[in-house]
């Protein structure tokens, strides 16, 4: 190992995750905190006949299950369960994982036909919070400044959106257009306003709150239409722009097809 090197800058940006070392070092305040709601276990399988991405939610059994193809032709399969079942999972990870997959018989059968290529991994340290994203000489972005349960998979989209706004604020501040502290304060306001509704919706969804009757009617309309059913779940989970699916013209089209 070489000798330690000290680098200095007028502004240090921390994009170092929910357990940000920079946030800890500067004592960044936390607000709108909600303790971890779900824990997740996952592993990787080979030889699974699967779509590129699959998503299943079982509200009554309190499970979210999703899988996706990786670059090594493996499939990552995740199971999310409430924190009050975390110890149950820890005692029998493989058994609870299989019991969860069995809630979707067809999917479970395809997984059994494959081969698990790695050990199981788990994560329960998934609190929901905002951090003040700036101070004298520092700023935070991504999960370091705003972290949510992975349920709606919003983190990467929010991070990519927010980094554009942070870059704009830094450019204005360091470029002399206005005081850096003012630009960064506006960034915090902008970030919070843009994320507030999704933050609350994600918390509600992760608690497996009952869905409204309208959703069940819509799900019935797409039951025999796999492509539309996939679009519905992706729109609800912000994997595509919700307005591309939940617009009057598209909803009228779907309900008309069931008559």
List the model feature ranges, each with a label.
Residues 2-6, 11, 15-113, 117-119:
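Conserved FAD-binding catalytic core of PHBH/FMO-like flavoproteins
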Residues 9, 46-50, 112-118, 123-124, ...:
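Short flexible/disordered coil segments
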Residues 23-24, 83-91, 153-156, 219-236:
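Short secondary-structure transition/capping segments
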Residues 29, 85, 151-154, 206:
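Conserved short-loop catalytic and cofactor-binding motifs
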Residues 87-181:
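FAD/FMN-dependent oxidoreductases across multiple families
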Residues 168-259:
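C-terminal helical "tail/cap" subdomain of flavin- and related membrane-associated enzymes
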């Amino acid at each position: 190992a070489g000798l330690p090197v000290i680098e200095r800058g007028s502004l240090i940006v921390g994009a170092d995750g929910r357990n940000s070392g920079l946030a800890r070092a500067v004592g960044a305040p936390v607000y709108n905190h909600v303790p971890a709601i779900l824990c997740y276990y996952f592993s990787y399988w080979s030889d699974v006949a699967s779509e590129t991405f699959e998503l299943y939610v079982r509200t009554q059994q309190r499970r979210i299950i999703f899988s996706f193809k990786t670059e090594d032709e493996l499939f990552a399969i995740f199971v999310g369960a409430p924190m009050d079942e975390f110890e149950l999972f820890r005692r029998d990870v493989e058994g609870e994982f299989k019991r969860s997959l069995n809630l979707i018989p067809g999917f479970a059968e395809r997984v059994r036909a494959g081969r698990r290529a790695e050990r199981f991994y788990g994560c329960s340290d998934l609190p929901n919070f905002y951090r003040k994203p700036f101070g004298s000489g520092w700023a935070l972005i991504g999960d370091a400044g705003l972290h949510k349960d992975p349920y709606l998979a919003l983190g990467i989209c929010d991070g990519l959106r927010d980094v554009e706004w942070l870059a704009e604020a830094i450019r204005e501040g360091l470029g002399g257009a206005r005081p850096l502290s003012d630009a960064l304060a506006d960034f915090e306001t902008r970030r919070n306003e843009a994320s507030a509704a999704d933050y609350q919706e994600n918390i509600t969804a992760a608690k497996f709150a009952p869905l409204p009757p309208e959703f069940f009617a819509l799900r019935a309309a797409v039951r025999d239409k796999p492509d539309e059913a996939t679009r519905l779940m992706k729109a609800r989970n912000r994997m595509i722009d919700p307005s591309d699916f939940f617009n009057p013209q598209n909803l009228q089209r779907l309900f008309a097809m069931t008559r």
